[in-house]
Design a protein with these regions (language model features):
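Transmembrane helix-boundary motif of multi-pass solute transporters/channels
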Residues: 1-27, 176, 214-220, 232-234, ...
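Transmembrane alpha-helical segments of multi-pass membrane transport proteins and ion-pumping complexes
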Residues: 2, 32-36, 44, 76-87, ...
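Inter-helical loop and helix-membrane interface segments of multi-pass membrane transporters/permeases
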Residues: 11-15, 45-70, 83-143, 172-199, ...
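Membrane-interface alpha-helices at helix entry/exit sites of multi-pass transporters
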Residues: 19-24, 56, 63-70, 227-236
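Juxtamembrane transmembrane-helix boundary signature
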Residues: 23-59, 254, 258
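Hydrophobic core segments of alpha-helical transmembrane domains in multi-pass membrane transport
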Residues: 24-33, 74-97, 126-140, 155-168, ...
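Central hydrophobic cores of alpha-helical transmembrane segments in multi-pass inner-membrane proteins
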Residues: 28-40, 50-52, 130-139, 213-220
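Membrane-embedded translocation segments of transport machinery
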Residues: 147, 151-271
Length: 271
């Protein structure tokens, strides 16, 4: 997802590379996985969306249903964020296909992203396109629409990641990026601030699994009684982590090869 391909590489670059990744993996196992199981459990037990799940499951007199209101607000805010970033990516696919980025160096591509952010009209247009496409997929339902399309797109994503990772590792200077990405340097973590690194790793662990906002409760409501909640959660966490680590293995070495700051921020993947 976007949390892996777009956000994880620049978070790893910003917070010190391998040291950040180690802390991130610890939070995934200790907090991310259990919360994911819990959200699936709530969804499967209630067979309802986040808006009604806690109303149906809570004991009489309890106030767990208050979470549903915060959850719905969080999901709307999250979709505002996701649709904008997805719009950036769709726009870059169009720009690449149209040859607008052909022959440009990293500085020129970075300027191109800056100009995109300065154009509210362009960003709004591509965000609307993403929303329309998303509604089209969701209108088919989870199993007939989202599940089928996701299977095809995931296979394409994994194949693309494999090709790009191999190419990135063959670039001149890429091994310095691999060292930064895979060899922990706790000295740099102290310079950045241990608290900042821990908070960044924790927020990324929750963000990448889409937990805490109740969205996984919706998917849990479609899980059959024969499916293991722990097993499904482990599969999701492992695949999610694999994609994140591979995305970093593409972006970080390429940054060192082209002289781009690995912690350059949200525009890093577009450079």
């Amino acid at each position: 997802g976007l949390g892996n391909v777009w956000k994880f590489p620049y978070m790893a670059g910003k917070y010190g590379g391998a040291a950040f990744i180690l802390i991130y993996l610890v939070f995934l196992v200790l907090l991310g996985l259990p919360v994911l199981v819990c959200e699936f459990a709530v969804g499967r037990a209630s067979r309802k969306s986040t808006a009604r799940a806690f109303h149906d499951l809570e004991p009489e007199g309890a106030n767990f249903h208050n979470f549903s209101y915060m959850s719905m607000v969080s999901n709307y805010v999250l979709m505002m964020f996701y649709t904008m970033v997805a719009g950036w990516m769709l726009y870059y696919c169009y720009a690449m296909a149209a040859g607008r980025l052909a022959g440009k160096d990293s500085t020129q591509v970075a300027d191109y992203f800056t100009r995109l952010q300065e154009s509210a009209g362009t960003m709004t247009l591509w965000m609307v396109i993403v929303v329309v496409l998303s509604f089209g997929v969701c209108s088919l339902g989870v199993q007939r629409g989202l599940e089928k399309i996701t299977k095809v797109m995931m296979m394409c994503l994994l194949a693309l990641i494999a090709v790009l990772a191999i190419h990135s590792l063959t670039l001149d200077g890429a091994m310095e990026g691999v060292k930064f990405y895979l060899v922990p340097d706790f000295t740099s973590m102290k310079e950045i601030g241990i608290g900042n690194v821990i908070f960044g790793a924790l927020s990324q662990a929750f963000f990448t699994l889409s937990i805490g906002a109740g969205s996984m409760t919706i998917f849990g409501s479609y899980l059959g009684k024969d499916r293991s909640l722990l097993g499904e959660s482990i599969h999701i966490t492992v695949l999610d982590t694999f994609v994140a680590l591979m995305a970093g293995l593409i972006i970080i070495p390429a940054c060192f090869a082209f002289g781009v700051e690995p912690g350059a921020g949200p525009g890093l993947v577009f450079i």
